[in-house]
């Protein structure tokens, strides 16, 4: 039952929150609203509804390139070697790896559709133009790169390069800008305060508006 997946449940709670706000069920002290929607996926257990897994046939998954002996020479940090010993997929077949990547991509698509529903609800309720939308992730995933899955305390691009999207139709900043600067999640709150005309960030993070 697709409705029992956490992605469906969390999306539904978000939609109900917005509908409740629009109906006026919030006191003046509770306005304007702040809604934090956190999807636990894509995490173990790797599962997604069939209509999503069907979108990503395992046999069509392209495996990430591998460097033979990556952790067998002196160029690899010891920490990375230990992580590979713990997490490396040394016994899985290529078909098994493709299947896991397939489900991971299906889970991401499932979340994408949930976010789409929430944005469409904002539009339907005439809330989108004056709502600041922030999309990001706490970390990436090896997902087959460097011969590993999930995550670890190392600084590979696949783990630390995550999206950060800030959108506000009524915002006084350039729209559609793509920036490759390195930033931190600690910068999100100062950015939101800046957008609302609040300038005291207490030196915790930086506003990203003028990057």
PLM-predicted stretches and their roles:
Residues 206:
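Conserved, charge-rich beta-strand/loop surface module that forms ligand/interface-binding patches
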Residues 1-10, 19-182, 195-202:
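Active-site-proximal cap/lid insertion segments
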Residues 209-211:
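Conserved small/polar residues in nucleotide/adenosyl-binding loops
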Residues 16:
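Active-site periphery "cap/insert" segments of enzyme catalytic domains
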Residues 185, 189:
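Zinc-coordinating Cys/His ligand positions in small cysteine/histidine-rich zinc-finger domains
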């Amino acid at each position: 039952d697709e409705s029992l997946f956490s992605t469906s449940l969390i999306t539904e709670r978000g939609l109900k929150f917005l509908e409740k706000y629009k109906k006026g069920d919030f006191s003046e002290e509770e306005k304007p609203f702040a809604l934090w929607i956190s999807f636990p996926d894509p995490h173990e257990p790797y599962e997604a509804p069939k209509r999503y897994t069907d979108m990503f046939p395992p046999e069509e998954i392209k495996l990430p390139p591998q460097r033979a002996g990556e952790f067998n020479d002196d160029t690899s940090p010891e920490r990375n070697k230990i992580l590979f010993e713990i997490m490396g997929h040394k016994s899985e077949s290529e078909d098994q790896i493709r299947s896991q990547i397939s489900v991971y991509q299906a889970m991401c698509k499932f979340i994408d559709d949930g976010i789409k529903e929430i944005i469409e609800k904002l539009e339907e309720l005439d809330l989108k133009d004056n709502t600041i939308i922030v999309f990001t992730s706490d970390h990436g995933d090896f997902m087959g790169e460097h011969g590993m899955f999930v995550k670890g305390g190392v600084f590979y691009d696949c783990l630390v390069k995550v999206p950060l999207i800030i959108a506000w139709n009524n915002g006084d900043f350039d729209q559609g800008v793509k920036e490759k600067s390195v930033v931190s999640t600690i910068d999100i709150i100062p950015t939101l305060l800046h957008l609302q005309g609040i300038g005291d960030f207490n030196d915790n993070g930086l506003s990203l508006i003028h990057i």
